[in-house]
Amino acid sequence: MMGIFLASVGFMFFSVLYVQQGLSSQAKFTELPRNVTATEGQNVEMSCAFQSGSASVYLEIQWWFLRGPEDLEQGTEAAGSQVELLPDRDPDNDGTKISTVKVQGNDISHKLQISKVRKKDEGLYECRVTDANYGELQEHKAQAYLKVNANSHARRMQAFEASPMWLQDTKPRKNASSVVPSSVHNSANQRMHSTSSPQAVAKIPKQSPQSGARIATSHGLSVLLLVCGFVKGALL
């Protein structure tokens, strides 16, 4: 009787363990991140969702940036498919952690959002899920590649900003002749008068104050003599 009881207990124990293992094996990604091609300046989203097959203590999603295009071989940049990877390397030395979300329950999802994507954002991204079950930690990974095409307008603006700028004074400038001092004009006029021909100078009679006085005196004497002549004639 005791043996039957022990056998029943053992059967139930192994049955529960088998069910737990079966449920754990059903843990999966319900939404895998997809490869994205964007143009510089656009907003980009990558989605990742996971469902645990058993009651978990907590679920955690981390988004990582692994490496840029210069670290990837030619021809494999956009050809990589969304494949769940096994943890085979040290995660702390694998790239740059971007964000973390942690929940209690069997389902978790998290979107990676990049605003105004730039060329340096291009590369391989990874969604890492940690399933904290009773007694053990399970890690699941999925990757996607972000390709960023150059924006011709943005490139032109960057080239314009990088080029030296020549500033032009828009203030109107005065005529060069108006800036010359008046003394310069006076000296120039004097030089012009001094270099004129002798014939032109000879045509302009010069009168001094003394000559004017002599002319006035002779004119007065002639008038006086004329008056005296009239008086003398009248007396005779």
UniProtKB/Swiss-Prot annotation:
Molecular function in Gene Ontology: identical protein binding
Keyword tags: Differentiation, Disulfide bond, Glycoprotein, Immunoglobulin domain, Secreted, Signal
Residue stretches of biased makeup (Polar residues): 175-199
Positions of transmembrane segments: none
Disulfide bonds: C48-C127
Subunit structure as annotated in this protein's UniProt entry: Homodimer.
Name of this protein: V-set and transmembrane domain-containing protein 2A
Lineage of origin: Eukaryota, Metazoa, Chordata, Craniata, Vertebrata
Protein encoded by which gene: Vstm2a
